[in-house]
Regions:
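Acidic/His- and Gly-rich active-site-bordering loop/insert found
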Residues: 2-119, 143-147
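An extended, acidic, His-containing surface patch that forms the Zn2+-binding/catalytic region
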Residues: 263-341, 347, 351-360, 367, ...
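Active-site metal-coordination/substrate-binding segment of hydrolases
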Residues: 86-155, 161, 442-454
Length: 468
């Protein structure tokens, strides 16, 4: 009864205050809160702009009479309610760079409303949902909703990069009874695959200059969140012209007199979805594997890629393929390849479901690297998360989602990383509904306002039901 009553009042409140919510979101979007360690200070470990975003949220909390705590610039929490037990909503204030602003239909850091959509960097990932959660605290306070469990909004500053924020937070604060991260999809993401970001590299002791074909240089952007979508190589030697023109059907080939420059471009895609697009690494290997007279150092790179990564998105060639009935199969993505006269390096991420341990993954990759004569470097590991569909949290979420949408709340798993995996008892839950397009991490990131209000209504129902 209480849930139904306050859900109705919440919708009315949101409809009356939507312009105010959008104004607060607009001010937060205007802060380009991208990690920048060149502006790092004692209370701004992730740089000036992320500190500015935190300061804006502190002012918001003080304005609304909400309890706020600053955790040395790593994270904030803003809360409302009483009781020893807590329910947490986990968000982040950092964003990925806007990229080429010419590809945006609106300025990325000036939120723009067109019909029922708003555009801007972070409107979906994750500033829009963050402001929505703060408005839930605000409406609970103004509607005097009786809460016997405190609701705490935890806000990190390094979700898009290193995750030091939540690591720092939970080193100094207890886990909540329940928690969820509105930084995913509906219905319920009850599983997130483990993620290992790593690289394989080799230093050259000598470089051959008399081979028929030499790869002088390979360049690609070191963005671990994407597939290898743009690759530049320089070819020299007596057969360089012949080899370069084999790429001409799908790449730009430029005669630079002393060498040939080949630019391979393929569609951008998130590294967790390597199966969705062609990638530049595969196109590079599919030509170079057949080249005779390739210099030994270049040949070792081509052989490494061909033997263990090329044309394989699920880890078969690594000897690590695994498929779980609930969480799906492993994925492997090479995100960048770079080589010069000193050596080469390839960055990759490997994602895996339950049933495959990180110890097994590390052991296999180390053995592979030793056999290939290359160095294996682990950059970051994010443990997998999984919560049983039978848990009280998921049961409450399922009921709220079905009540609001009239559809079943199915559980599913993703390769994505949300703060849900920092929780002992939590999942990712919205805000994006099935079939919605948000262009997260891309130009023209967008948020549907009707969907946002619907998501808030679902969250209100869940938070009230978990008070019992």
């Amino acid at each position: 009864m209480m849930e139904s009553k306050f859900s109705t009042e919440a919708i009315e409140y949101l409809e009356q205050h939507i312009d105010e919510l959008l104004n607060d979101l607009s001010e937060l979007v205007a802060i380009p809160s991208v990690r920048d360690l060149t502006t790092q200070t004692e209370n701004a470990p992730f740089g000036y702009q992320i500190r500015q975003a935190f300061d804006y949220l502190i002012k918001f909390a003080e304005r609304e009479g909400l309890e706020v705590r600053d955790h040395q610039g790593y994270a904030l929490d803003i809360s409302f309610g009483q009781g020893d037990q807590e329910i947490a909503l986990l968000h982040h204030v950092d964003v990925v760079p806007a990229g080429d602003e010419m590809l945006w239909r609106t300025p990325p850091y000036r939120m723009t409303k067109i019909d029922n959509m708003v555009f801007g960097r972070g409107v979906t990932d994750n500033k829009g949902p963050l402001i929505a959660s703060l408005y839930i605290l605000k409406l609970f306070k103004q509607l005097t909703v009786p809460l016997n469990k405190k609701i705490r909004v935890i806000i990190g500053g390094a979700e898009e990069t290193t995750w030091e924020c939540v690591e720092h937070y939970f080193q100094h604060n207890p886990q909540p009874e329940y928690g969820f991260s509105p930084d995913g999809d509906f219905p319920i993401v009850n599983g997130e695959k483990g993620i290992l970001y790593a690289s394989l590299g080799k230093q050259f002791s000598a470089r051959s200059s008399d081979s028929a074909c030499q790869i002088r240089r390979i360049e690609s952007e070191r963005d671990r969140t994407s597939t290898c979508h743009f690759l530049v190589l320089e070819l020299a030697g007596s057969s360089a012209e012949k080899v370069a023109h084999q790429f001409a059907a799908f790449a730009d080939v430029i005669d630079c007199q002393s060498h040939y420059r080949v630019e391979i471009s393929t569609p951008w895609e998130k590294s967790r979805n390597p199966h969705k697009v062609d990638n530049s690494m595969d196109k590079f290997v599919n030509i170079m594997r057949h080249v005779e007279g390739l210099d030994p150092n270049s040949a070792s790179l081509v052989h490494l890629l061909d033997s263990h990564f090329a044309n394989d998105y699920v880890g078969h060639k690594l000897g690590l393929y695994h498929n779980d009935d609930e969480m799906g199969y492993t994925t492997c993505c090479v995100s960048a390849i770079n080589m010069d006269s000193h050596g080469y390096n390839l960055d990759f991420d490997f994602r895996f479901p339950k049933g495959l341990s990180i110890e097994r993954v590390r052991s296999q990759l180390l053995a592979l690297s030793q056999q290939a004569g290359v160095n294996f470097v682990e950059h970051q590991y994010l443990p997998l998360s999984y919560l049983s569909p039978e848990s009280a949290l998921i049961q409450a979420m399922g009921k709220a989602y079905s009540d609001v949408t009239g559809t079943d709340a199915n559980c599913f798993s993703k390769g994505a990383a949300s703060y849900a995996r920092a929780l002992e008892h939590g999942v990712a839950f919205g805000p994006t509904f099935p079939e919605e397009v948000t262009f997260v991490h891309e130009p023209n990131e967008q948020l549907n306002l009707e969907s946002l209000i619907k998501a808030i209504t679902i969250y209100v129902k869940v938070l009230i039901s978990l008070q019992e």
